[in-house]
Amino acid sequence: MRARRLALLSTFAMTLATTTLLGAAPAHADGPGVGSPWIVSVGDSYISGEAGRWAGNSNNGESYIDALGSTAYYDNAGHTAEVINRCHRSSSAEVYTGVVNGYNLACSGAKTSTYTDSNGYFKPGLDFYSSGGQQGQALMLQTFAATHNVKAIAVSIGGNNFNFGSIVQSCVSDFLGSPSWYPDYCNDDSSVTANFTSANITAQTTAIKSGLLNLRTAMRNAGYADGSWSLVVQDYMSPVPNGSGFRYSQSGYTRQSTGGCGFWDNDANWANGSALPTINTAVKNAATQAGIASTKVLELANAFNGRRLCESTVGLIEEKGLAGWWSAGAVDQTEWVNQIRTVSTAGSDYYIQESLHPNYWGQGALANCLTLAWNGGAVRGGTCTRGANGLNSYGEPNMVLS
């Protein structure tokens, strides 16, 4: 993804130059409808670039899958630190397509409303929060769009409103805490089912709708006419296969201890057949209810099929006999989703929050999907799925938008 990384560095340089030249009178100031076009990404970890450092999975050591190195999440102008700690806006994030300027405002853990998590990390929502120098993503978008020609906004939001992370934790805990002859499923835990009541689905759909409308307000405040920019609303991809598609048996603990995918078959089937469709339907219903001009839906539910975590069609680096992520064909033989880590990652470069997120290859696939949706500026929606094996000229997995 060399071309995409060069585009990102160009973005950093432009941001730094803008800061340096404050007060100078440009001949033609960029802004609504003026200047090079930009795509801005907003939302949560499924668009911020979470886990984008790692290409595939390995239990033999980090070096075999470390595609970006220790600066992967450093998104400030100098590429020396995170702008917001633990937002994990990686340099492989999908908005850096290589075909159009990209700017990443998304933050891992974000919900529709701004909050501070239990560990004290600030999580900007799709709102106009402003306090102590911290801002919501809608306000950040408004500021950026006023001085850049934003032609499209890509958004992923809603998963954390449904407490996706806690659900995954419950599923893995139940897998590890019960035997195969008497499995304890997470899909009937009260803490899980509470997220999928009719009342909560309605409430979260409304919250997502409100977040999307805040994006329109931000663009209006920045001087954009409705319809002069496009909103690309993406849903969520399936990260694990159905029960029959795992390459590790659910008997014993290998599924988690080796594969990092501790789900009972029954829970994996429920996740793909009920939980994911419910969340994705809420996202799409919210987009429809918001009624924002030039809204396009980018459907990703099946985008990673065949490359999902622990799927029988792929494997760990060592299971496939590869020297490392850089080996020819690695993109087609290894997983596009990061392993689930449930214990302390102290002493390693891994983060628990990277669990079950699109990795370096996954981010590249999503970037290709977004490129196809961008469509040279004639933005379109559709269903994105895997294309032919191999990589395109930008180092991304081949994808198809239909």
Which positions does each model-derived feature cover?
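Catalytic nucleophile-elbow at a beta strand-turn-alpha helix junction centered on a G-D-S/GDSL motif
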Residues: 37-54, 65, 160-162, 360
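Mobile gating loops/cap/lid regions near enzyme active sites that modulate substrate access
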Residues: 238-357
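A structural motif corresponding to the C-terminal end of an alpha-helix
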Residues: 91-102, 204-230, 267-268, 272-300
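Short, solvent-exposed loop/turn and secondary-structure capping segments
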Residues: 32-33, 49-55, 114-118, 164-169, ...
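Solvent-exposed loop/turn segments at secondary-structure junctions
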Residues: 45-49, 107-113, 159-164, 236-241, ...
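Conserved SGNH/GDSL esterase-like catalytic core that processes O-acyl groups on lipids
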Residues: 62-200
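Short amphipathic alpha-helices and their capping/turn segments at secondary-structure boundaries
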Residues: 26-41, 134-153, 209-230
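Secretory targeting and sorting signals
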Residues: 1-29
